[in-house]
């Protein structure tokens, strides 16, 4: 299972996270938090959220440093 980015349209932090993942060459699956009731209840105030195997790696403001630290685990 790869990375999953839980995001929403119109979210500037989400757009920044998408750009950072793309710049780092990290492939991910996009899931719209507003399209799924479970995701909405769990993550609506936490987006963007990056998951790996169902585990939260990052949420909120993504930075290159935070992303590098989390991906090296």
Regions found by a protein language model. Give the residues of each.
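Local sequence-structure signature of Cys/Sec-based thiol-disulfide redox active-site neighborhoods
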Residues: 1-24
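Small/polar loops that bind or transfer phosphate-bearing groups
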Residues: 6, 31, 59
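Thiol-based oxidoreductase modules, predominantly thioredoxin-like and allied folds used
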Residues: 27-37
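Short conserved loop adjoining the S-adenosyl-L-methionine
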Residues: 40
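Surface-exposed interaction regions that form or flank ligand-binding interfaces
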Residues: 43
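A short, hydrophobic beta-strand/beta-hairpin element that forms part of a small beta-sheet core
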Residues: 47-56
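Non-catalytic, surface beta->alpha helical segment in thiol-disulfide oxidoreductase systems
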Residues: 55-73
